[in-house]
Amino acid sequence: MKQDRLRNFSIIAHIDHGKSTLADKLILATSAIPEREMKEQVLDNMDLERERGITIKAQTVRLKHHAKDGQNYIFNMIDTPGHVDFTYEVSRSLAACEGVLLVVDATQGIQAQTIANLNLALQHNLAIIPVINKIDLPSADPDFIKEQLEDVLQIESSNAVLVSAKEGIGIDELMEAVVRQIPSPTGNTSEKLQALLFDAWYDAYRGVMVLVKIQQGSLKVGEEIMMMATGNRFIVEELGTFNPKQEKCAQLQVGEVGYLVANIKQLDQTKVGDTITHSTNPCEKPLPGYKEAKPMVFSGLYPISGEDYEDLRDALKKLTLNDASFSYEAETSTALGFGFRCGFLGLLHMEIVRERIEREYKVDLLTTAPTVIYKIITTDGKTLMIDNPSKLKEQKNIDHLEEPYVLGTIIVPEEYIGVVMALVRDRRGIQKKMEYLNPQTVLLQYELPFNEIVLDFYDRLKSGTKGYASFDYEFIDFRTSNLVKLDVLLNGELVDALSLIAHKDKVYYQGRDLAKK
């Protein structure tokens, strides 16, 4: 396929705005899967993803489209995680694209996640096609959404495509918009190989499978490759594309998206965002944007029955095969027995792992309260990171503690401003911005300690606004805070698993609430 006939794009949207349904309809419209074989949300493989209506891992599918200009095109549609916990994964998937379909619900309008995802797309200088979905609903107001696109997002609304993914309305027009408005990939086949690794997972039969986008050069079966972040070298055994079923090919050329198999035994030998090049004739420098995905939320997982300890360990080991951002280490509690200290990208990530263990491995769990990672600055200027409050007593010569802060964006109906402000004030929030998106809807931005939102902030926000508020956040930095360690005694005995780090002004109330439980 000629390079100028390739279109690589992603669909980004707030949760429940119809991203997966739209992906399904595009697959149907290009006859990639016969309708009788189609199941809803074909790109969402994991049962949990389908059930929750979210995408956890990036998926990709290659679609053929015969356009009105008489030419045949290849669409590489890269489905991305839509949740804040997986922001880095989203950014790497977007780096494999030249454009995005920005889906907005015609009945709900712009939400916090819409803005967060758009900002990621703008950082990658991607072409943006606004897609106003659910126009078949009686409460749909496409003209109002167009105003929002221009006023709030500063996006030209004249090229917005009106669709109903559920009813299949506007799908042909959308595919023509992809041809016209999303540029073909740049790059040169004669250059040294530069391939972006944007996802990887473990296959029981073939080892680790890697999703790549060829940014420069080309890649053939039998060639030796090198991972630039780790220096690991492998021989390419198989290349292919998802159509959406796996289809082998002899090579991947510049601009193409596909998978590779290279006898990679462990997932941690691959890093999402890494650059793959030839080992014998490597490129001069890696692609920009790579960083290690680090756990931000930590919790203890203990089997309710001590007999399940080995099963839990096996379950955690298997989960890390497909999730390199998840970490665990054995720990012992005097009250809870043997368990594991686990690290997650965020609260949703933690919930998904816990649910998978209980559902797939049949282990009933007791989960300790989630905590964030803290920074200790010692009197001699050293910096230490701790993820477990019980480790604080081991540290000597502490000068001060620092905690992570996030920038939170809340979009809420005007009548609930007071409720939101009271909640955020209680969580030590600092207001940075307040903007009316229209007379009825307000955007609020706050700097908040991450520790204040990991427990029940989202639930309290939703219940206080009758479900109308949307919330998103991004990590900013670590800041010095007046933090203390709270220990819990049960019948005079210290229960280390219940220890927590809290702000001095709130430690009494948190201790009282714990005692009530």
Where does each model-flagged region fall?
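Structural and coupling elements of P-loop NTPases
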Residues: 1-517
